[in-house]
Amino acid sequence: MSKKPVALIILDGFALRDEDKGNAVTHAKKPNFDRFWNEYPHATLQASGEAVGLPEGQMGNSEVGHLNIGAGRIVYQSLTRVNVAIREGEFEQNETLLAAVKHAKEKGTNLHLFGLLSDGGVHSHIEHLYALLRLAKSEGLEKVYIHGFLDGRDVAPQSAETYLKELNEKIEEYGVGEIATLSGRYYSMDRDKRWERVEKSYRAMVYGEGPSYTSAEECVKDSYENGIYDEFVLPSVITKEDGSPVATIQDEDAVIFYNFRPDRAIQISNTFANEDFRSFDRGEKHPKNLHFVCLTHFSETVDGYVAFKPNNLDNTLGEVLSQNNLKQLRIAETEKYPHVTFFMSGGREAEFPGETRILIDSPKVATYDLKPEMSAYEVTDALLAEIEGDKQDAILLNFANPDMVGHSGMLEPTVKAIETVDECLGKIVDAILAKGGTAIITADHGNADEVITLEGNPMTAHTTNPVPVIVTKQGLELREDGILGDLAPTMLTLLDVAQPKEMTGKTLIK
């Protein structure tokens, strides 16, 4: 029996932008894309910022794009997830955070907050520290101590004074919190098993060992005078007037580690949280019965509580297709194969029942501007054979060219990449239409739409421009305010499959 396949075709890195200069999408001759755009219902989708779970104004990327597409909902990345929780009042009601505060109150012990002291947004955000201070204040906690890790890597190398000034203003405003130690991230956030670095941080925080200063500002000033900048500031102790440490971490204390990115948070967390820690001798005073909270899930190896548990993405597009006994194909060349498989399945490696995967090798060249067609023709031939063989109900396809060649920042090769993809697109969509099927033509983020800046410089990064969506079925009308998370519900509508409640995206078909 002839199948009427529904295909989701992702032109990776292909967005729409009015400005013609440096725009490979407008420069390319793409008769097939233009034909489908003119003949069929079309619209644009937001593929960056909060529409895909990133901070406002941040460009999208392939991983995030495919996660959102496959999930059929906005998948909040950790930074945005915590930001949204703060904005909507959920942060101060977080049971895990409240339990840490309650522990310190009931035991009459201290609450320690530690993490990277910047707004870099890569490992942490200082606003999350401020939210914790507000939470502690609202719960009536007085003994709250901050162990600041200085950045200088995701932000300017000598920016610590700015963040300390702002932090001290917040401490003054809220009437809670005191800085107890400072340490460059080189020590406290090592991830390469350089335990001697982590130990220096640990001993400052637990034993009050290390250079001592009467204020955080004095510590930074002294380091700068010695040519040591933020990232490399030696773990240092802030002292009271009598020379004793402001605070050390002791038995029964509570700790909240407010970094959200795991890789550089694991080792120092192991040091405090794990009873069976053996990487260095923690000494006699190692704090017992700590109530240790990680902001997000750092690792199975960390024996702590988790405030924002991982989002398990249930009922992704692939899972729903499988539950409905529909045959699905994932096809791409090497560069984007993980995206149409692992990321589109919500971070799942295994295939679903009824899922077939075709991987076409990407060409072995130093950079793809040397071969802008990449393996698009081979991908197309393999897919046409599948369509002819009536094997698939649903097809998930990625063309890597506009993104991978766009990263070269070179106009002519990127134009060639798009013209190649357009040729392939025509063959594939015509084959699907000949079977009575439907194609959804779209993209995951921008790139090829700006490969040269208005000043004439190469532009190798992604863009925040909207991406196209075309549905090759007459008589439909599409919404104009769509996001990537609306693509899976649209595909399910075309397949006449019920949308699960976990998919909070909405079909684009009016």
Swiss-Prot record:
Enzyme class: isomerase
GO MF assignments: manganese ion binding; phosphoglycerate mutase activity
Pathway: Carbohydrate degradation; glycolysis; pyruvate from D-glyceraldehyde 3-phosphate: step 3/5
Catalytic reactions of this protein: (2R)-2-phosphoglycerate = (2R)-3-phosphoglycerate
Residues at the catalytic site: 62 (phosphoserine intermediate)
Binding site for substrate: 123, 153-154, 185, 191, 261-264, 336
List of residues binding Mn(2+) 1: 403, 407, 462
Cofactor(s) required, per the database record: Mn(2+)
Family matches, as InterPro entries: Alkaline_phosphatase_core_sf, BPG-indep_PGM_N, Metalloenzyme, PGAM_B_sf, Pgm_bpd_ind
GO CC terms in record: cytosol
One of the protein's GO biological processes: glucose catabolic process
Assembly notes: Monomer.
Protein name, entry field: 2,3-bisphosphoglycerate-independent phosphoglycerate mutase
Species assigned in the record: Priestia megaterium (strain DSM 319 / IMG 1521) (Bacillus megaterium)
